[in-house]
């Protein structure tokens, strides 16, 4: 089989759901389990995508992810005594349809990014982002409505 077909089969076996064969994930790609990751149609990820899928990560149709993006679902206490007990929990991340995530973006646990959204390069997404906007910064904030 072709290299493209082989890569698709590996991703299909690794991930919880892949909507179609129009998926491109450049290497390297890192994840915790894979089975918690659901990817929609016509997905593209540039190199060095990291997804810590302790909880479900859902990515909609027609999404593009730049290089060096990290998506985290794992949470730890900010209290040092509790943190030292190694207690961990997870919160899901949801990314809507038609989303472009720029390079070196970090998406934190429990975040929902709406549809038709652009997240600017280098942003740290700490809270939900609504549909139809451009959002940038650390912390990531809406700077423009689109559509």
In which residue ranges do the predicted regions lie?
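Extended beta-solenoid/beta-helix repeat architectures
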Residues: 111-114, 129
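Flexible, glycine/small-residue-enriched loop-and-beta-strand segment within the central core
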Residues: 29-39, 44-112, 138-140, 144-147
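Terminal amphipathic alpha-helical/low-complexity segments used for targeting or macromolecular assembly
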Residues: 1-22, 140-143
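Short hydrophobic beta-strand element within catalytic cores of glycosyltransferases
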Residues: 125-126
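Short-chain dehydrogenase/reductase
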Residues: 100, 118, 134-136
């Amino acid at each position: 089989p072709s290299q493209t077909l082989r890569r698709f089969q590996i991703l299909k076996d690794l991930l919880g759901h892949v909507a179609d064969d129009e998926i491109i994930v450049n290497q390297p790609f890192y994840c915790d389990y894979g089975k918690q990751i659901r990817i929609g149609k016509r997905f593209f990820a540039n190199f060095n995508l990291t997804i810590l899928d302790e909880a479900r990560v859902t990515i909609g149709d027609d999404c593009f992810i730049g290089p060096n993006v990290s998506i985290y679902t794992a949470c730890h206490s900010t209290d040092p005594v509790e943190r030292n007990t190694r207690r961990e929990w997870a919160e899901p991340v949801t990314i809507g349809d038609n989303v472009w995530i720029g390079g070196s973006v970090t998406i934190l646990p429990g975040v929902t990014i709406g549809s038709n959204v652009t997240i600017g390069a280098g942003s740290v997404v700490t809270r939900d982002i609504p549909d139809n906007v451009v959002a940038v910064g650390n912390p990531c904030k809406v700077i423009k409505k689109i559509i």
